């Protein structure tokens, strides 16, 4: 028996995605993220992730 009403499960949601988007909108944070990674760049601009 297949339940066709539910479809595929929802993809995993990254809890840091909203912060990643904030960093991407700041050109300086985005550039730093390319060099050292998003979490370190975000920490330097906005504090802890």
Curated annotation (Swiss-Prot):
Molecular function terms from GO: calcium ion binding; hormone activity; hydroxyapatite binding; structural constituent of bone
Binding site for Ca(2+) 2: 21, 24
PROSITE patterns named in the record: GLA_1 (PS00011), GLA_2 (PS50998)
Post-translational modification: Gamma-carboxyglutamic acid residues are formed by vitamin K dependent carboxylation. These residues are essential for the binding of calcium.
Domain named Gla: residues: 1-47
InterPro entries referenced in this protein's UniProt entry, alphabetically: GLA-like_dom_SF, GLA_domain, Osteocalcin, Osteocalcin/MGP
Any one of the GO BP annotations: learning or memory
Disulfide bonds: 23-29
Major location category of this protein: secreted
Binding site for Ca(2+) 1: 17
GO cellular component terms, A-Z: cytoplasm; extracellular region
Annotated binding of Ca(2+) 3, by residue: 24, 30
Keywords: Biomineralization, Calcium, Disulfide bond, Gamma-carboxyglutamic acid, Hormone, Hydroxylation, Metal-binding, Secreted
PTM-bearing positions, type 4-hydroxyproline: 9
Compartment annotation: Secreted
Superkingdom assignment: Eukaryota
Entry-annotated residues carrying 4-carboxyglutamate: 17, 21, 24
Record carries keyword Secreted: yes
Family: Belongs to the osteocalcin/matrix Gla protein family.
General function of this protein: The carboxylated form is one of the main organic components of the bone matrix, which constitutes 1-2% of the total bone protein: it acts as a negative regulator of bone formation and is required to limit bone formation without impairing bone resorption or mineralization. The carboxylated form binds strongly to apatite and calcium. The uncarboxylated form acts as a hormone secreted by osteoblasts, which regulates different cellular processes, such as energy metabolism, male fertility and brain development. Regulates of energy metabolism by acting as a hormone favoring pancreatic beta-cell proliferation, insulin secretion and sensitivity and energy expenditure.
PANTHER family: OSTEOCALCIN
Name of this chain's protein: Osteocalcin
Organism this protein belongs to: Camelus bactrianus
